[in-house]
Design a protein with these regions (language model features):
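Low-complexity, intrinsically disordered P/S/T-rich segments
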Residues: 1-190, 381
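P-loop NTPase catalytic phosphate-binding loop
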Residues: 39-43, 132-137, 141, 159-285, ...
């Protein structure tokens, strides 16, 4: 069969839409959201102080280590617990002693000796981790006599933070092994911070905001700052036209008035719904894909598409909001916590004690990432972390961080008010947008009665009742019942 056969297939048709976007990218390059403020300079590292006199290194006191090791070994020996080997990891404020007990010793026995070990070391805030997840050891954390301060500068200058391939990198501080700890807020997706007064919550918030200012251009992230204390976040007023978001007709970008919070939260819910509509039109699943598609000029701005910045909502004292506004705040916060993660709205909520009447179960379930500073009792620690341990911290920025699985002990980076002031001054002095980022309009029901009452629709006995009250010069339900022979 020698007849030659010619095979022909039709070429795939090129998608028109794609060609247009490719041509636009070839002609103009990818869309650059930072174009409007292209000369924006990020704050320099020089604006932060180095709080350590000795150049930021950790001073290792070998005598102290040896002494503590001997005390731990002796205490455990008294209770007939032999140790195969022991290893110390020195951190900024805490040293971790990892011990491997001899075979056949029950862990629960060591765990029950927590107070005895604390007594023999005469130290405050000892925590026993038995066993350390991922290692076959038991950890005993002992505070150092001379703690090293972790400055914000050392954390931000670290390669971990500078080379972080993250959407919203937050440098929280240093771990026990003195490594800088950087975590992505976009992956969390929301963060709950709690701890007693004066243990470093507001400093922690400042550290988070500072690390975002050091890593993100104003076009990429916007903050909504809610500050019922009125004084904690006022420094960030200077960067209003760069980084803050607010309702269109309000004066201050930082919300201190609790009634305005309700409008802002509801407006944020509208923003969330609008963003989901845009994502639905663009046929993408999250803000990262959406912005990538928009940068590649595949979405037409005439259809309402625009570059979407991340929005971070920071609430400094959540309990105060719940007391004054209650249910009206709870509903939008719960909605945002459940739904807002895919479209780049993230919540950071700080409160003294996240008990059920402050943070309901629904909201709490959507905050897998928790930070606990020192609290006074085991019950408080359980409320925050669902496990104990936060009651044994030292205070002053010593904290436990969890993302739903293991607890990690960190020393929070310290950032002082003058430093924040210098950073905001540096950013605020540069060319800015015309105004803060505007959230959608939301007009709540005007305060007053929300019942539908018609004034003409009066009771038959209204006039008599009015006369009785005027004559008696006082009014009560029982008085009207007696005089008008009702009920």
């Amino acid at each position: 069969n020698d007849v030659a056969m010619e095979v022909e297939t039709a070429a795939e048709e090129e998608e028109v839409d794609d060609r247009l976007s490719r041509k636009a990218v070839e002609d103009y390059g990818e869309f650059d959201p930072t174009l409007e403020l292209r000369n924006f300079k990020f704050p320099t590292i020089e604006l932060l102080k180095d709080h350590n006199a000795n150049g930021g290194g950790i001073t290792i006191d070998h005598e102290e280590l040896e002494e503590n090791k001997n005390k731990i070994v002796d205490t455990l020996k008294n209770y007939k617990i032999d140790i195969a080997q022991i290893k110390a990891t020195v951190g900024p404020t805490v040293t971790l002693y990892e011990i491997i007990p001899e075979a056949g010793i029950r862990i629960s026995k060591i765990k029950s000796l927590e107070d005895d070990i604390a007594l023999s070391l005469s130290a405050l805030g000892i925590r026993i981790i038995a066993p350390i997840p991922g290692k076959g050891t038991i950890g005993i954390e002992v505070p150092n006599k001379n703690a090293t301060m972790v400055s914000m500068r050392s954390v931000i200058a670290s390669p971990r933070f500078q080379n972080a391939e993250m959407e919203l990198p937050m440098a929280l501080g240093k771990t026990i092994s003195n490594e800088t700890f950087v975590v992505d807020l976009a992956k969390m997706p929301h963060l709950l911070m709690a701890g007693a007064t004066g243990q470093g919550k507001s400093v922690g918030l400042n550290a988070i905001l500072t690390s975002l200012l050091y890593s993100k251009h104003p076009a990429e992230v916007k903050f909504i700052l809610v500050d019922p204390k009125k004084v904690e976040l006022t420094l960030f007023n200077k960067i209003e036209r760069h980084y803050l978001a607010k309702l269109p007709d309000t004066e201050d970008a930082i919300i201190t008035d609790n009634t305005k919070v309700i409008n802002t939260l509801n407006s944020l819910c509208i923003e969330m719904d609008n963003r989901y509509e845009l994502l639905k039109d663009a046929m993408v699943r999250n803000i990262k894909e959406y912005n990538a598609k928009f940068k590649a000029r595949k979405l037409n701005p005439e259809n309402g598409h625009k570059f979407l910045p991340y929005i971070v909502l920071v609430v400094d004292e959540f309990a105060d909001l719940i007391m004054t506004a209650g249910k009206e705040v709870e509903a939008p916060i719960a909605r945002l916590a459940q739904l807002a993660r895919a479209i780049g709205i993230h919540l950071i909520i700080a409160t003294q004690r996240p008990s059920v009447n402050v943070i309901t179960g629904i909201i709490k379930a959507n905050f897998p990432a928790r930070i606990a500073f020192r609290v006074t009792s085991k019950i408080d620690s359980r409320t925050i972390l669902d496990s104990q341990g936060a009651d044994q911290l030292i205070g002053k920025g010593d904290m436990l961080f969890t993302q739903g699985n293991t607890l990690l002990r960190l020393q929070c980076a310290f950032v002082d008010t003058p430093e924040v002031d210098r950073i905001t001054e540096f950013i605020g002095s540069q060319k800015a947008y015309a105004d803060a980022y505007h959230l959608p309009e939301y007009s709540g029901e005007e305060s007053g009665t929300s019942l539908d009452i018609d004034v003409n629709d009066r009771d038959n006995l209204f006039r008599e009742a009015a006369e009785v009250i005027v004559i008696a010069q006082q009014g009560s339900a029982s008085l009207l019942q007696r005089k008008l022979k009702l009920g």
